[in-house]
């Protein structure tokens, strides 16, 4: 039996001298205000126990990590037809690249780059008003984490809406190819709000637990997705979850994961645990600098890498 709390504490101790490393995302004004000298880690094991250290109870903007939850909703709604509109291949380009999109006729490379996530949001929006789609996501994440206090930070959403020119360009470009079915402002309104979900490491580690437990949420006992779908979402997180740093993350950490420019990373150790780390300073490819290091240390200490201990 592993001493998970001991491992979590030792990782936190290792990160303490390095607080403040990396560069906070400054192109979203609200994120630029976040104190970089923070680090939190939470692990929720498949028996439902959560272990925390550091700033694990401080809410932060989960940003692109929300794409995992939106993809889960879209697959529940549209099934495999989702893949008619978005691919499943790593991009090798920056998360907001428009060049690849033009070359591939408006079909984004995968659901975790911005263009792909916007298409996924468009699918979830089908049959809904924007407010209803936002509400559906919020209810879903609260249900997964078993926590009704999770909320959306409207200030962050407005900040993104005011500065998200590249996302407007991507959305209009895909609309011109017929791969966006709703008005751009509706789809992006939902997208900016989903990215502004505010969660703690503890909440996020619980929300991702269904992916570590064959699609079943051990907190509620309910099946969220099939075993097969959980496996496939994990596969996409492993290959595409960290922008053009996905290969490097697989090499060093060896766990399915999804990062966000708010400094969070949600990772999955299938059969063992769901993990959330957060530190606002980002590395050169937009992933949490300390978060990535902490997960590499975790994989080494636990032997949880999907490629073997």
From Swiss-Prot:
Binding site residues for substrate: 64, 114, 160, 167, 191, 243, 261
Pfam families: Glutaminase
SUPFAM superfamilies registered for this protein in UniProt: beta-lactamase/transpeptidase-like
Residue stretches spanning the membrane: none
Gene Ontology molecular function: glutaminase activity
Catalytic activity: L-glutamine + H2O = L-glutamate + NH4(+)
InterPro entries: Beta-lactam/transpept-like, Glutaminase
Gene Ontology biological process terms from the UniProt entry: glutamate biosynthetic process; glutamine catabolic process
Keyword line: Hydrolase
EC number: 3.5.1.2
PANTHER family: GLUTAMINASE
Stored HAMAP family: Glutaminase (MF_00313)
Family to which this protein belongs: Belongs to the glutaminase family.
Subunit: Homotetramer.
NCBIfam families for this protein: Gln_ase, PRK00971.1-1, PRK00971.1-2
Record-given protein name: Glutaminase
Organism: Agrobacterium fabrum (strain C58 / ATCC 33970) (Agrobacterium tumefaciens (strain C58))
Taxonomic lineage: Bacteria, Pseudomonadati, Pseudomonadota, Alphaproteobacteria, Hyphomicrobiales
GN (gene name): glsA
């Amino acid at each position: 039996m592993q001493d998970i709390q001991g491992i979590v504490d030792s990782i936190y101790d290792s990160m303490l001298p390095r607080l403040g490393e990396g560069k906070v995302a400054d192109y979203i004004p609200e994120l630029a205000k976040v104190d970089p000298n923070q680090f939190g880690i939470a692990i929720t094991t498949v028996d439902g126990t959560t272990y925390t250290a550091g700033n694990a109870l401080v809410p932060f903007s989960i940003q692109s990590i929300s794409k995992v939850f939106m993809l889960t909703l879209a697959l529940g709604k549209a099934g495999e037809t989702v893949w008619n509109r978005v691919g499943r291949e790593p991009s090798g380009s920056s998360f907001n690249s428009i060049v690849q999109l033009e070359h591939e006729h408006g079909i984004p490379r995968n659901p975790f780059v911005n263009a792909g996530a916007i298409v996924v949001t468009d699918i979830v929006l089908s049959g809904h008003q924007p407010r209803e789609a936002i509400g559906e996501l919020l209810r879903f994440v609260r249900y997964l984490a078993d926590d009704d206090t999770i909320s959306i930070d409207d200030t962050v959403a407005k900040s993104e809406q005011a500065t998200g020119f590249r996302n407007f360009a991507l959305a209009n470009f895909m609309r011109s190819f017929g791969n966006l079915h709703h008005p751009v402002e509706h789809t992006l309104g939902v997208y900016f709000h989903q990215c502004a979900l505010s969660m703690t490491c503890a909440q996020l580690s619980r929300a991702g637990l269904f992916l570590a437990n064959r699609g079943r949420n051990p907190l509620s006992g309910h099946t969220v997705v099939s075993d097969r779908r959980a496996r496939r979402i994990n596969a996409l997180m492993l290959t595409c979850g960290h922008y053009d740093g996905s290969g490097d993350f697989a090499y060093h950490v060896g766990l399915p994961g999804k990062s966000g420019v708010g400094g969070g990373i949600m990772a999955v150790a299938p059969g063992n645990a769901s993990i959330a780390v957060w530190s606002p300073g980002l590395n050169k490819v937009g992933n949490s600098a300390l978060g990535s290091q902490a997960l590499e240390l975790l994989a080494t200490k636990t032997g949880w890498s999907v490629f073997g201990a």
